[in-house]
């Protein structure tokens, strides 16, 4: 292994040469307390920045083993270190000068959710830490400006590494609180199901966000307060006794007037599948980890999905046991979203009336009298909701503000009244007796068919070059084919979208074989990631710093929206 002095000498030798001379710097260098790896050098100063990584031996980093002895603690620790490294690195970015991206330092900017990322990892066997980031190697025009790179790597970077990646130099109390919070959150998650619950919202939680494009908490808002009938408590290892609203398994209806907080509560539950940082307000909003938001998605593609549970006898004679379309309607898209969620082993559906297809959710009495059952291809969700719970163990939480039909099948009815939840189950059930359901549930339907098998991506293998490009949080493209994820609403971070793009590529090129069904492929992928790490799915020789761990549910959602599946 080369020493840092070797790198210093090399930089002197290549100064003012053509930019391509930077390629000779690739390798790993010993900086005494850490190792710097130059993993990939950009082709010119205007190209994507160079890829670098820092490696600190566990005995030097000095983090207590009790802070990374479980997976969830490792994620919390690495998330915190990434935030610290980002704070210090952003202060020195562009202090070195030059053309193009010269002087840039860049690393993942974490949001409110705590996610596993390729940016920072820790080896649980010895505490070794690796951090991956980007840097723009300085140039004058298109010639090497080695003096400025020397400034970046020897003058600026060492202090960033020292102040953020060594236990003795960081705020130890703050880190301790991060680890303790992760333990408390994990305690609730692991006991939620055994308590008969699908979600928990702690008293005092702050659910609304400051605006429509921010995930930061709204100041001076009404804090969450559980109704007595739904209040449960958890004894946490560090927080102690905590109380809040436990939403039981079964069918829960959330009602209330407009702007009273129904959708805000549901949105918090959607993201409750992730841990949140201290101060977010949703630290103890915990949802079943398999929960899926279900909505209408006009225009999406559907490939060989069995939607016959909800759609049958189409006038064009189209087969709904293996349904295909490039342009789904509201009802067929929502039917597909339900069945595909079942395929992912989801045990909780989250549904908002505002984003649902009305004809998929209900058929009122007058419509049933005018358009007879044998003339209607759609079996509405209301007729399947009890079967989904009693037969498949899938609970539902539904937000409704204009339709009272779901009072009948609901087990629990909660009214949001000026942002405060109230238990109105008895009152609502009594009122519903005066409006009996005319629609009778159909006989039980055969289990949906989940044997969809897809061939390897031969069309991709024929391509001379395969390019995956992330298009913000809501989409990615593989060559010229865009995968639209706008309505996969539980993606929390752009780096998850990037990971989904590489995951889809990996499954098409390495796992799909025409024999394994889609769920088996997804399970195999998740097992590979669990065993070998998220960076396994990359197509490069170096670890990219821009991947965040998605759930199996989003992995399969991305697969299902790929139009060349």
Which residues does each PLM region occupy?
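Conserved P-loop NTPase
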Residues: 416-497
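Terminal-proximal interaction/regulatory segments of ATP-powered molecular machines
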Residues: 484-565
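Glycine-rich phosphate-binding P-loop
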Residues: 242-274
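N-terminal pre-Walker A segment at the start of P-loop NTPase domains
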Residues: 208-243, 278, 286-291, 295-302, ...
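Flexible beta-alpha connector loops of hexameric P-loop NTPases
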Residues: 300, 310-331, 363-378
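N-terminal accessory targeting/assembly segments
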Residues: 1-187, 191-196, 207
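Carboxylate/His-rich catalytic cores and anion/metal-binding grooves
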Residues: 193-199, 203, 259, 266-297, ...
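Conserved P-loop NTPase nucleotide-binding/switch module
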Residues: 341-385, 389, 402-408, 412-429
């Amino acid at each position: 292994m080369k020493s840092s002095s070797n790198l210093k000498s090399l930089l002197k030798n290549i100064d003012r040469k053509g930019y391509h001379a930077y390629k000779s710097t690739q390798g790993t260098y010993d900086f005494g307390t850490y190792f710097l790896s130059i993993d990939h050098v950009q082709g010119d100063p205007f190209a994507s920045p160079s890829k670098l990584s820092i490696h600190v031996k566990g005995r030097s980093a000095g983090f207590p083993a009790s802070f990374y002895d479980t997976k969830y603690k490792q994620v919390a620790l690495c998330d915190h270190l990434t935030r610290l490294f980002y704070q210090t690195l952003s202060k020195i970015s562009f202090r070195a000068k030059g053309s193009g991206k010269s002087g840039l330092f860049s690393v993942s900017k974490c949001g409110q959710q705590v996610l596993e990322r390729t940016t920072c990892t820790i080896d649980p066997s010895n505490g070794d830490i690796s951090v991956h980031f980007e840097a723009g190697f300085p140039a004058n025009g298109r010639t090497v400006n080695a003096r400025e790179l020397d400034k970046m790597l020897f003058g600026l970077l060492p202090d960033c590494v020292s102040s953020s990646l060594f236990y003795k130099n960081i705020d130890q109390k703050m880190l301790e609180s991060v680890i303790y919070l992760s333990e408390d959150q994990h305690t609730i998650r692991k006991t939620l199901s055994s308590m008969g619950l699908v979600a928990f919202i702690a008293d005092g939680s702050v659910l609304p966000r400051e605006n429509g494009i921010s995930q930061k908490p709204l100041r001076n808002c009404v804090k969450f307060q559980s109704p007595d009938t739904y209040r449960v408590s958890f004894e946490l290892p560090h927080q102690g006794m905590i109380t809040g609203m436990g939403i039981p398994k079964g069918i829960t209806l959330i009602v209330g007037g407009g702007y009273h907080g129904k959708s805000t509560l549901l949105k918090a539950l959607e993201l409750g599948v992730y841990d949140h940082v201290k101060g977010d307000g949703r630290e103890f909003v915990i949802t079943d980890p398999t929960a899926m938001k279900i909505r209408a998605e006009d225009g999406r593609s559907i490939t060989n999905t069995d939607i016959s549970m909800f759609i049958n006898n189409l006038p064009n004679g189209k087969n709904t046991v293996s349904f295909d379309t490039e342009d789904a309607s509201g009802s067929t898209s929502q039917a597909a979203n339900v069945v595909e969620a079942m395929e992912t082993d989801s045990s909780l559906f989250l549904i908002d009336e505002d984003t649902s297809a009305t004809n998929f959710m209900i058929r009122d009495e007058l419509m049933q009298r005018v358009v007879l059952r044998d003339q209607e291809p759609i079996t509405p969700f209301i007729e399947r909701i009890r079967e989904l719970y009693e037969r498949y163990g899938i609970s539902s939480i539904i937000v409704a503000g204009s339709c009272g039909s779901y009072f009948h099948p609901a087990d629990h009815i909660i009214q949001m009244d000026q942002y405060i939840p109230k238990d109105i189950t008895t009152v609502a059930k009594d009122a519903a007796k005066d409006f009996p359901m005319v629609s009778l549930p159909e006989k039980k339907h055969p289990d949906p068919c989940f044997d969809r098998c897809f061939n390897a991506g031969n069309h991709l293998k024929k391509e001379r070059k395969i390019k995956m490009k992330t298009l913000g949080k809501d989409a990615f493209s593989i060559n010229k084919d865009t995968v639209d994820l706008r309505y996969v609403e539980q993606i929390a971070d752009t780096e998850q979208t990037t990971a989904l793009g590489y995951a889809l590529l990996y499954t098409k090129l390495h796992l799909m074989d025409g024999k394994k069904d889609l769920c088996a492929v997804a399970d195999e992928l998740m097992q590979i990631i669990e065993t070998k790490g998220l960076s396994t799915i990359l197509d490069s020789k170096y670890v990219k710093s821009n991947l965040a761990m998605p759930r199996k549910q989003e992995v399969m959602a991305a697969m299902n929206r790929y139009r060349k599946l």
